[in-house]
C-alpha cells in the first residue's frame, strides 16, 4: 500500500526516445539532443536512438522481412512514452534520414509504433530561421500517424554556431533556459496522453 504522505512527492517518470535527423557527428541537432538530456526535468528520462543503420524505406524490403535496425527503432518507440526529435533543415525541408525514420516507424499502418504517441520537435541551424520550415513540414506527418505533437513553445535555435561551443555544448544561457522550459512543458504534455 502506498503511503499517502509520500505519494504526492512521487512523480511519474516518462521515458522519451530521442533522435536527431542528422548523421553528422558534429551536428548541432545531436548537440541539442545532448543538451536536452542534460536539462531535462526529473520527470523525463531521454534515451537516444541512432538512425544511421536504417535502410531507405522500400516496400519490397519490408515484404521480404523487416530489417533488424527498423525493428529496433520501432521497439524503442513502442517502449517509450514519447518522442523527442531534433531536426536540421536541409534545403528548406525535412532531412531525408528523418523522414525515412518516420516512414519506417509508421509501418504497417495498423501497427504503427507512432500511433497515439506524444512528440516534440526542436531544431538548431546556423541560419536565421532555426529550422522553422523543416519543423512545419514535419508536423503534418504526425496527423497521418496519429502522433500528438507539442505545438508550443517552439525550439528554433538560430545561429547555432554562436550558441554551442567547440565541444558541442550548449553554452548560450538564454537558449538553455528556454530549452529547460520547453522540456518541462513537454513533460506536462506527455502526462495528458499516458496513464
Language-model features and meaning:
Residues 16, 29, 33, 70, ...:
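A general structural signal for well-ordered alpha-helical segments in protein cores
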Amino acid at each position: 500500500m502506498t503511503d499517502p504522505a509520500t505519494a504526492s512527492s512521487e512523480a511519474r517518470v516518462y521515458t522519451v526516445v530521442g533522435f536527431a535527423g542528422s548523421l553528422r557527428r558534429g551536428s548541432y541537432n545531436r548537440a541539442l539532443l545532448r543538451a536536452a538530456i542534460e536539462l531535462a526535468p526529473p520527470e523525463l528520462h531521454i534515451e537516444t536512438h541512432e538512425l544511421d543503420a536504417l535502410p531507405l524505406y522500400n516496400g519490397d524490403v519490408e515484404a521480404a522481412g523487416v530489417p533488424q535496425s527498423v525493428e529496433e527503432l520501432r521497439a524503442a518507440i513502442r517502449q517509450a512514452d514519447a518522442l523527442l526529435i531534433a531536426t536540421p533543415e536541409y534545403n528548406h525541408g525535412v532531412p531525408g534520414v528523418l523522414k525515412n525514420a518516420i516512414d519506417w516507424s509508421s509501418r504497417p499502418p495498423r501497427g504503427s509504433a507512432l500511433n497515439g504517441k506524444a512528440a516534440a520537435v526542436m531544431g538548431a541551424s546556423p541560419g536565421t530561421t532555426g529550422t522553422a520550415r523543416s519543423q512545419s513540414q514535419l508536423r503534418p506527418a504526425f496527423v497521418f500517424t496519429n502522433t500528438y505533437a507539442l505545438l508550443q513553445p517552439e525550439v528554433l535555435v538560430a545561429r547555432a554556431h554562436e550558441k554551442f561551443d567547440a565541444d558541442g555544448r550548449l553554452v548560450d544561457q538564454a537558449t538553455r533556459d528556454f530549452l529547460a522550459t520547453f522540456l518541462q512543458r513537454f513533460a506536462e504534455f506527455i502526462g495528458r496522453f499516458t496513464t
